Amino acid sequence: MAARGAMLRYLRVNVNPTIQNPRECVLPFSILLRRFSEEVRGSFLDKSEVTDRVLSVVKNFQKVDPSKVTPKANFQNDLGLDSLDSVEVVMALEEEFGFEIPDNEADKIQSIDLAVDFIASHPQAK
């Protein structure tokens, strides 16, 4: 026991803080909250822009009749797409907006308005 204590005293290194007053370098939480919330708030796309881009992607999909594409159109009922076609549309939307839609969310996107709502509320959409 005595040898252990002597060894620890011998190996102990003094550390001096480089900051004179640590409280001076800490930002108040309200400043951090404001800074980060402004970044997130400013990064969402405008819903009308998202709608136009989604409509354009769906109209350019080869299995869709462009005259049937409306903001409320359902992929299966109105546009006649099967589940595999719907997956391809979602993949095209991922490419258009530059982010990956998780599988569990992609399964829920069955219409143009659902796609617009999801993309407009996603902070990574470009």
Curated annotation (Swiss-Prot):
Coiled coil: none annotated. It is found in: Mitochondrion. It comes from the Eukaryota. One of its GO terms (molecular function) is acyl carrier activity. InterPro entries: ACP, ACP-like_sf, PP-bd_ACP, Ppantetheine_attach_site. It holds the Pfam family PP-binding. Its main location: mitochondrion. GO terms for biological process: mitochondrial electron transport, NADH to ubiquinone; proton transmembrane transport. The modification O-(pantetheine 4'-phosphoryl)serine is found at S83. The keyword Hydrolase does not apply. The keyword Lipid biosynthesis applies. GO terms for cellular component: cytosol; mitochondrial matrix; mitochondrion; nucleus. 4'-phosphopantetheine is transferred from CoA to a specific serine of the apo-ACP-like protein. Residues 1-36 form a transit peptide. Keywords: Electron transport, Fatty acid biosynthesis, Fatty acid metabolism, Lipid biosynthesis, Lipid metabolism, Mitochondrion, Phosphopantetheine, Phosphoprotein, Respiratory chain, Transit peptide, Transport. Gene3D superfamilies: ACP-like. Pathway: Lipid metabolism; fatty acid biosynthesis. Residues 48-123 form the Carrier domain. Carrier of the growing fatty acid chain in fatty acid biosynthesis. May be involved in the synthesis of short and medium chain fatty acids. Accessory and non-catalytic subunit of the mitochondrial membrane respiratory chain NADH dehydrogenase (Complex I), which functions in the transfer of electrons from NADH to the respiratory chain. Belongs to the acyl carrier protein (ACP) family. Complex I is composed of at least 49 different subunits. This is Acyl carrier protein 2, mitochondrial.
